[in-house]
Amino acid sequence: FEYHSSANFRDIHCRGAAVFSYCDFYGRVVFTGARYDAQADFDGITCHAAADFSRCLYRGAANFLTSTYVGPVDFSGSTYLADAHFGDSVYYNRVDFSRCVYRGPAIFSHSLYEGPVRRERCLYDQDADFQACVYRSTVAASHSTYGGSANFLGSVWADETS
Protein backbone atom coordinates (compact mmCIF):
# COMPACT_ATOMS: atom_id res chain seq x y z
CA PHE A 1 0.00 0.00 0.00
CA GLU A 2 1.02 3.58 -0.54
CA TYR A 3 -0.07 6.35 1.82
CA HIS A 4 0.44 9.70 0.05
CA SER A 5 -0.70 11.92 2.91
CA SER A 6 -0.33 11.62 6.67
CA ALA A 7 -1.36 8.31 8.24
CA ASN A 8 -2.57 8.22 11.84
CA PHE A 9 -2.76 4.87 13.66
CA ARG A 10 -2.34 6.40 17.13
CA ASP A 11 -3.51 4.22 20.04
CA ILE A 12 -4.80 1.37 17.86
CA HIS A 13 -5.19 -2.03 19.51
CA CYS A 14 -4.53 -5.03 17.27
CA ARG A 15 -5.70 -8.28 18.88
CA GLY A 16 -4.53 -10.44 15.97
CA ALA A 17 -1.48 -10.16 13.74
CA ALA A 18 -0.81 -6.69 12.33
CA VAL A 19 0.73 -6.52 8.86
CA PHE A 20 2.06 -3.24 7.44
CA SER A 21 4.92 -4.86 5.50
CA TYR A 22 6.15 -3.11 2.35
CA CYS A 23 3.98 -0.04 2.83
CA ASP A 24 5.24 3.32 1.54
CA PHE A 25 4.41 6.27 3.78
CA TYR A 26 4.98 9.58 1.96
CA GLY A 27 3.52 11.81 4.68
CA ARG A 28 4.04 11.73 8.43
CA VAL A 29 3.02 8.40 9.97
CA VAL A 30 1.97 8.04 13.62
CA PHE A 31 1.60 4.78 15.55
CA THR A 32 2.15 6.33 19.01
CA GLY A 33 0.65 4.29 21.84
CA ALA A 34 -0.39 1.35 19.66
CA ARG A 35 -0.79 -2.10 21.25
CA TYR A 36 -0.13 -5.33 19.40
CA ASP A 37 -1.28 -8.58 21.07
CA ALA A 38 0.24 -10.80 18.36
CA GLN A 39 3.04 -10.47 15.84
CA ALA A 40 3.47 -7.02 14.24
CA ASP A 41 5.08 -6.97 10.79
CA PHE A 42 6.53 -3.75 9.40
CA ASP A 43 9.21 -5.44 7.26
CA GLY A 44 10.26 -3.47 4.20
CA ILE A 45 8.37 -0.28 4.99
CA THR A 46 9.61 3.03 3.62
CA CYS A 47 8.89 6.21 5.57
CA HIS A 48 9.67 9.31 3.50
CA ALA A 49 8.71 11.77 6.26
CA ALA A 50 8.73 11.65 10.06
CA ALA A 51 7.59 8.37 11.64
CA ASP A 52 6.46 7.98 15.25
CA PHE A 53 6.32 4.50 16.78
CA SER A 54 6.86 5.74 20.36
CA ARG A 55 5.24 4.28 23.48
CA CYS A 56 3.97 1.15 21.72
CA LEU A 57 3.48 -2.26 23.33
CA TYR A 58 4.39 -5.37 21.33
CA ARG A 59 3.29 -8.65 22.95
CA GLY A 60 4.32 -10.77 19.94
CA ALA A 61 7.38 -10.46 17.73
CA ALA A 62 7.97 -6.99 16.27
CA ASN A 63 9.51 -7.07 12.80
CA PHE A 64 10.97 -3.94 11.18
CA LEU A 65 13.54 -5.69 8.96
CA THR A 66 14.82 -4.23 5.66
CA SER A 67 13.07 -0.91 6.25
CA THR A 68 14.06 2.58 5.08
CA TYR A 69 13.49 5.77 7.06
CA VAL A 70 14.18 9.03 5.20
CA GLY A 71 12.74 11.35 7.86
CA PRO A 72 13.36 11.18 11.61
CA VAL A 73 11.93 8.14 13.39
CA ASP A 74 10.94 7.74 17.05
CA PHE A 75 10.63 4.33 18.74
CA SER A 76 11.23 5.74 22.25
CA GLY A 77 9.45 4.37 25.30
CA SER A 78 8.21 1.21 23.58
CA THR A 79 8.07 -2.24 25.18
CA TYR A 80 8.85 -5.44 23.28
CA LEU A 81 7.81 -8.59 25.16
CA ALA A 82 9.06 -11.00 22.44
CA ASP A 83 11.71 -10.74 19.71
CA ALA A 84 12.36 -7.27 18.26
CA HIS A 85 13.93 -7.23 14.77
CA PHE A 86 15.25 -3.97 13.29
CA GLY A 87 18.15 -5.33 11.20
CA ASP A 88 19.13 -4.68 7.59
CA SER A 89 17.55 -1.22 7.69
CA VAL A 90 18.63 2.28 6.67
CA TYR A 91 18.07 5.40 8.76
CA TYR A 92 18.88 8.63 6.88
CA ASN A 93 17.87 10.98 9.70
CA ARG A 94 17.87 10.87 13.50
CA VAL A 95 16.45 7.79 15.23
CA ASP A 96 15.42 7.49 18.88
CA PHE A 97 15.21 4.12 20.67
CA SER A 98 15.60 5.66 24.17
CA ARG A 99 13.80 4.21 27.19
CA CYS A 100 12.75 1.04 25.37
CA VAL A 101 12.33 -2.29 27.16
CA TYR A 102 13.29 -5.47 25.29
CA ARG A 103 12.18 -8.66 27.10
CA GLY A 104 13.19 -10.94 24.19
CA PRO A 105 16.22 -10.79 21.90
CA ALA A 106 16.76 -7.39 20.22
CA ILE A 107 18.35 -7.51 16.77
CA PHE A 108 19.62 -4.35 15.05
CA SER A 109 22.44 -5.90 12.97
CA HIS A 110 23.56 -4.87 9.47
CA SER A 111 21.91 -1.44 9.58
CA LEU A 112 23.12 1.95 8.35
CA TYR A 113 22.60 5.04 10.51
CA GLU A 114 23.31 8.34 8.70
CA GLY A 115 21.93 10.60 11.46
CA PRO A 116 22.23 10.70 15.26
CA VAL A 117 21.15 7.59 17.19
CA ARG A 118 19.74 7.61 20.74
CA ARG A 119 19.59 4.38 22.76
CA GLU A 120 19.77 5.83 26.26
CA ARG A 121 18.20 4.19 29.31
CA CYS A 122 17.16 1.00 27.51
CA LEU A 123 16.69 -2.37 29.19
CA TYR A 124 17.76 -5.46 27.24
CA ASP A 125 16.74 -8.57 29.23
CA GLN A 126 18.23 -11.01 26.70
CA ASP A 127 20.81 -10.79 23.92
CA ALA A 128 21.17 -7.56 21.93
CA ASP A 129 22.77 -7.78 18.48
CA PHE A 130 24.23 -4.64 16.91
CA GLN A 131 26.86 -6.35 14.76
CA ALA A 132 28.02 -4.97 11.40
CA CYS A 133 26.21 -1.65 11.76
CA VAL A 134 27.57 1.60 10.34
CA TYR A 135 27.10 4.78 12.38
CA ARG A 136 27.95 8.00 10.53
CA SER A 137 26.91 10.42 13.29
CA THR A 138 26.68 10.51 17.08
CA VAL A 139 25.46 7.56 19.15
CA ALA A 140 24.13 8.05 22.69
CA ALA A 141 23.64 4.77 24.55
CA SER A 142 24.39 5.68 28.16
CA HIS A 143 22.60 4.24 31.19
CA SER A 144 21.36 1.14 29.34
CA THR A 145 21.27 -2.31 30.98
CA TYR A 146 22.15 -5.55 29.20
CA GLY A 147 20.89 -8.80 30.78
CA GLY A 148 22.37 -10.99 28.04
CA SER A 149 25.24 -10.50 25.64
CA ALA A 150 25.64 -7.30 23.61
CA ASN A 151 27.30 -7.93 20.24
CA PHE A 152 28.85 -4.93 18.43
CA LEU A 153 31.30 -7.02 16.37
CA GLY A 154 32.18 -5.44 13.02
CA SER A 155 30.33 -2.17 13.62
CA VAL A 156 31.87 1.08 12.36
CA TRP A 157 31.66 4.19 14.53
CA ALA A 158 32.34 7.42 12.64
CA ASP A 159 31.66 10.05 15.29
CA GLU A 160 31.21 10.62 19.01
CA THR A 161 29.75 7.79 21.07
CA SER A 162 28.61 8.00 24.69
Could you tell me what each predicted segment is?
Residues 1-162:
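N-terminal leader/targeting and pre-domain segments
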